[in-house]
Amino acid sequence: MSIEIANIKKSFGRTQVLNDISLDIPSGQMVALLGPSGSGKTTLLRIIAGLEHQTSGHIRFHGTDVSRLHARDRKVGFVFQHYALFRHMTVFDNITFGLTVLPRRERPNAAAIKAKVTKLLEMVQLAHLADRYPAQLSGGQKQRVALARALAVEPQILLLDEPFGALDAQVRKELRRWLRQLHEELKFTSVFVTHDQEEATEVADRVVVMSQGNIEQADAPNQVWREPATRFVLEFMGEVNRLQGTIRGGQFHVGAHRWPLGYTPAYQGPVDLFLRPWEVDISRRTSLDSPLPVQVLEASPKGHYTQLVVQPLGWYNEPLTVVMHGDDAPQHGERLFVGLQHARLYNGDERIETRDEELALAQSA
């Protein structure tokens, strides 16, 4: 079941929380709405579900406008962060509930309901807990029950509002893998809200990064990491070094160091430089690619690579986080050399293109 979000705006009083949002979600895709608090991601999810109504715009499921349909008529499954299980019902009865309250013409008979719930319990790996009550379950088990209950009525679309937010880190990781496997098996269309970058990129087919009621980028997880569309996406995804410098003529100056950009940008003046740890050139010997001396402050082996915190020597004040590959991990206090050639430069929110990027843009024009 595909979802079309067309020009959705939403305001609460004088506060605009969604600004002309448009997004197409193909059938069978799992999409993460990722952003900080106040970005509008949960409001958008609730509008898709019919739990909130947009100020303007349309929601279409497989081409049919459902904008005015009540939530119960949209055939959407919704999983909340805090489970919302019935405390006085067993696991089996919690999952059964949605089926028993269907209109008579849609309601399966008792035998069919029992068979379906039994199958769902096996699918969510809780068949041995069918007779227990919510108070007797762990957080991860409760969330599996909530998901099985949502799937019992065979929703056209599954929506999840920070489904793992109340769980500890290890349980979250296990449930993320399990949800992804379940999605691969059932191929349902799903949209989930999260503020966790790792969760979004690990589980989703596509990540929609939101900020202040706008979509900053909607792309495959790897693309969001490697080719952030805006400065906000670059910074929000985390693991990024930021240095302050200046463009003068055709050169970029940072501290006592400078290097040629290969052309003279129209903009001249202060800029911010961004580099993810694995984008920093690093070597034990000075070279054209790695001319800047640094000293190792911390070294954290991660298996096939080592994550380092290094202090620039004489050319910048703040430490950098870098990644060095290989088994021969540097020691605390060791001198290394880094290069910043792969940096992204920004004047405020405006990207300053490098020479290679300028050529690529010219060739594609």
From Swiss-Prot:
It holds the Pfam family ABC_tran. The keyword Translocase applies. Gene3D superfamilies: P-loop containing nucleotide triphosphate hydrolases (3.40.50.300). Its EC number is 7.3.2.3. It is a peripheral membrane protein. Belongs to the ABC transporter superfamily. Sulfate/tungstate importer (TC 3.A.1.6) family. This is Sulfate/thiosulfate import ATP-binding protein CysA. It comes from Shigella flexneri.
